[in-house]
Amino acid sequence: MAVAEFVGPGEWLGAELRDSDAWRVPLTEAHRREVLAACDSEESFPLPTLAPTLHRVRDELMHGRGFVLVQGVPVEQMTERQCERAALGLARHVGAVVPQGPGARPLMHVRDTGADPSRAKSYQHSGRLGFHSDPTDVVALLCVRPAKSGGLSAIVSSVAVHNELVRTRPDLAELLYQPWWHDRRTGDGPDSFYAKPICTVDDDGRVSVAYGPDYLRSAQRGATVPPFTPAQEETMALLDELTNDTRFALTMDLRAGDMQFLNNHVALHSRTAYEDYREPHRRRHLLRLWLTTT
């Protein structure tokens, strides 16, 4: 098949945005008080002055660059239960919160459990996460506490990476539209593995990139999964090179109170490995939510 570049605001370069505040949304003191009050409200998290800002966040996610960093959520004044309520409440003004997999909860605690990174879910270990997308429209991460060191978040425009591949290696770009085997990490049986393309084009003619190299590689353990072809290996190596190129990637050091929103169709995200504190009450803790916007 012939592949083509896609033009739009979802194509951006990290090098051009690194010193920009255009993607940051700092909360005012009035907004912070409103969030605290909403945490104790019997209503459905009312945000009379902040809600319009969050609606603009949604618009930027769906029709703009595809990512926003909200800053200043007053987590330092909240209990863990209030942080959960704040994360859910803020997210619901952006989209519909959905379970994170069959039988899963709508809110996940991202903490190191000491699990093996090659077999565990990404929110359960402290190892490095390569650039990937989550299987939902939008992923939101509220930082309650950062790590002692490491744990940096990096994002990249998957549209920009796709277009670079089309320009430089159209033969490999074509492979992204063919089925690749993925690992659900739900066990060792055949139902744990499935095949789907990395790139698809939606009804509006926009490219959507669903990429998770860690899950592609771990799928190789499946008894019925064919080994990577040399061309697939080359494609993954080039994607790894491009996504980690500082020209494309934008790094964020999430601090307590930062809430990152990301459109998975047009952006990939990663995390560096991290070292945690020994004391449980100081350890890295993020809250993750999946949203739909349709």
Feature annotation, model-predicted:
Residues 1-50, 55-56, 63, 68, ...:
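Active-site environment of non-heme Fe oxygenases that use a 2-His-1-carboxylate facial triad
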